[in-house]
């Protein structure tokens, strides 16, 4: 279901599950396993996640819903999805979602779990679960609220109407919108810029930003001071400062 292509320190993870790249349980399981492998691979510093075919992902596999008979089973399905979305968001290496076609329901929940989002201008992004008489279950209510604010999040969920990629940028849901034919190249360019930085520094910033969700400002500021001290004495920091003084491009090794 997933294929991997590597370009330098960037791993391009493509989902291929036609026709709509639905997020079946087997897809989420494989995604988790792929992330485990990337975490241990020093040659992977940044990951791009995108969908093959017409869509990024049109959502959860509705056929799996028909096998659910109890409230407890449904809640367990939601918790399993939430766990993988949290794993994506807490992943120590940057994950960029490259979104074309549609990111709907679980597809948008997955995209929102990624750290950055590049979208095709004409892509459709939404949480249409209420159209089925249900609600988002993979933490979509919370992440959409975080990105676009209460009023827009409620509007999108209550109406089930998606927004375009261009609108997603305007609402803070995506970083950049480009013509679809430029999507993957734009994501690669961004990924390569990040991959050129010290992976130690990149991961430290990601850790601090993630901790801000659950800790106080002063706790995070203290953690920032601690990590500043740890990063400052690394070989990468010495290389970066030396390269600046010598007016050359630094070569970071992640040490």
What are the functions of these language-model segments?
Residues 8-16, 29-69, 86-98, 116, ...:
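A structural preference for short, pocket-lining loop segments at secondary-structure junctions
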Residues 26-30, 80, 87, 186, ...:
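Charged catalytic carboxylate motif
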Residues 87-200, 230-234, 239-242, 248:
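Crotonase-fold acyl-CoA enzyme core
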Residues 249-255:
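Short C-terminal tail/terminal secondary-structure segment
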């Amino acid at each position: 279901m997933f294929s991997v292509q590597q370009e330098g320190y960037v791993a391009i993870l493509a989902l291929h599950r036609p026709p709509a790249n639905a997020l079946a349980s087997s897809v989420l399981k494989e995604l988790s396993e792929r992330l485990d492998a990337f975490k241990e691979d020093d040659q992977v510093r940044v990951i791009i996640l995108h969908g093959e075919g017409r869509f990024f992902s049109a959502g959860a596999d509705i056929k799996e819903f028909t096998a659910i008979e109890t409230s407890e089973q449904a809640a367990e399905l939601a918790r399993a999805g939430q766990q993988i979305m949290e794993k994506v968001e807490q992943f120590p290496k940057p994950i960029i979602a490259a979104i074309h076609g549609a990111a709907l329901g679980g597809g948008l929940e997955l995209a929102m779990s990624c750290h950055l989002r590049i979208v095709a201008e004409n892509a459709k992004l939404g949480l249409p679960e209420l159209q089925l008489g249900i609600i988002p279950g993979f933490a979509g209510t919370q992440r959409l609220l975080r990105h676009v604010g209460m009023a827009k999040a409620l509007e999108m969920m209550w109406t089930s109407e998606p927004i375009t990629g261009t609108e997603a940028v305007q609402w803070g849901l995506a970083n950049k919108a480009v013509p679809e034919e430029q999507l993957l190249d734009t994501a690669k360019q961004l990924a390569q810029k990040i991959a050129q930085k010290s992976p130690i520094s990149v991961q430290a910033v990601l850790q601090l930003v993630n901790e801000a969700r659950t800790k106080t400002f002063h706790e995070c500021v203290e953690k920032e001071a601690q990590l500043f001290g740890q990063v400052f004495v690394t070989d990468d920091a010495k290389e970066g400062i030396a390269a600046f003084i010598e007016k050359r491009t630094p070569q970071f090794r992640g040490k």
